[in-house]
């Protein structure tokens, strides 16, 4: 018996190769946006993380360990948003699995909202809470009131972070739309090496 690959795998590889060749025909600026769009979403997520970190540090009166708290608040949201945008939007677009502009915009917006906006704010809570407990900079609650305390502390931060979160969501959705249009433009280009008479 011979080991054969299913026909779908061969078609998928050919489709991926065709899309990659077409993308390489785009001008450099457009190709850069198509290939590195997830990095821009990650940079915005890192900025949201630093803003949330700063707001929680002010509320909890934490003045020590600026770099120790700022570094993970920039790096972790950057990596998370970058990888999730690449996995949910860029990779499916480049492999032909995502073929609907509305789906691309929705996926991009959701990744921007969850991983680029909300996740950095939620990540700032334990980071700065741990620093406040370590340096005794704020009066922390008793065991029974922990949830109410963090909800009360987080409300003003979420109000102030509303604009950056919405901006991140809108930016990621716009980027998804732009990448979809660039991919359609690339697919309409003639095959390299073919001469049209």
From Swiss-Prot:
Keyword Nuclease appears in the UniProt entry: no
Protein's membrane topology: Multi-pass membrane protein
Cystine crosslinks: none
Topology, Mitochondrial matrix side: 1-35, 80-107, 178-197
Coiled-coil features, chain-numbered ranges: none
Signal peptide: none
Keyword list, A-Z: Membrane, Mitochondrion, Mitochondrion inner membrane, Transmembrane, Transmembrane helix
Entries under Pfam families matching the protein: TMEM126 (PF07114)
Superkingdom of source: Eukaryota
Record topology, Mitochondrial intermembrane segments: 57-58, 129-160
Transmembrane segments: 36-56, 59-79, 108-128, 161-177
GO BP term, pick one: mitochondrial protein quality control
One term under GO cellular component: mitochondrial inner membrane
Record carries keyword Mitochondrion: yes
InterPro entries referenced in this protein's UniProt entry, alphabetically: TMEM126
Subcellular location(s) per record: Mitochondrion inner membrane
Family: Belongs to the TMEM126 family.
Known function: Protein required for the cotranslational protein quality control in the inner membrane of the mitochondria. Associates with newly synthesized polypeptides and may act as a chaperone that cooperates with OXA1L for the insertion of newly synthesized mitochondrial proteins into the inner membrane. Required for the assembly of the ND4 module of mitochondrial complex I.
Subunit relationships: Interacts with OXA1L; promoting cotranslational quality control in mitochondria.
Protein known as: Transmembrane protein 126A
Protein species of origin: Bos taurus (Bovine)
Taxonomic lineage: Eukaryota, Metazoa, Chordata, Craniata, Vertebrata
Gene name in the database record: TMEM126A
